[in-house]
Amino acid sequence: MTTETIDGVRLTTKANVYFDGKCVSHSFALPDGTKKSVGVVLPATLTFGTAAAEIMECVGGSCEYRLDGSDEWKQSGPGERFQVPANSKFDIRVTEAYHYICHYA
């Protein structure tokens, strides 16, 4: 199931812009203080580092991702999620706009 709306959030209005605009996101917090971000990755191959563990949820488009230490690219599409450990990194390869929610652990 793909998340289409998130009610009752506190949104940071200034965008987080990475990789010369290839990734743009907005951070928000749920009423219980849980932090997340929602954004889009435009066509590119990028490497992201993580401080906290992350769960990437695809809400539109698709991507291929490769976790740190792996040679295997895996596909992720709408309604699918993948997990990235804390203090790690992952590669993401996008050929069409990839819309996501990042759930921080």
From Swiss-Prot:
It holds the Pfam family Ppnp. It catalyses: a purine D-ribonucleoside + phosphate = a purine nucleobase + alpha-D-ribose 1-phosphate; adenosine + phosphate = alpha-D-ribose 1-phosphate + adenine; cytidine + phosphate = cytosine + alpha-D-ribose 1-phosphate; guanosine + phosphate = alpha-D-ribose 1-phosphate + guanine. Its EC number is 2.4.2.1, 2.4.2.2. GO terms for molecular function: guanosine phosphorylase activity; purine-nucleoside phosphorylase activity; thymidine phosphorylase activity; uridine phosphorylase activity. SUPFAM superfamilies: RmlC-like cupins. Keywords: Glycosyltransferase, Transferase. GO terms for cellular component: cytosol. It is an enzyme of class 2 (transferase). Disulfide bonds: none annotated. The keyword Transferase applies. PANTHER family: PYRIMIDINE/PURINE NUCLEOSIDE PHOSPHORYLASE, PYRIMIDINE_PURINE NUCLEOSIDE PHOSPHORYLASE. Catalyzes the phosphorolysis of diverse nucleosides, yielding D-ribose 1-phosphate and the respective free bases. Can use uridine, adenosine, guanosine, cytidine, thymidine, inosine and xanthosine as substrates. Also catalyzes the reverse reactions. Belongs to the nucleoside phosphorylase PpnP family. This is Pyrimidine/purine nucleoside phosphorylase. It comes from Ralstonia nicotianae (strain ATCC BAA-1114 / GMI1000).
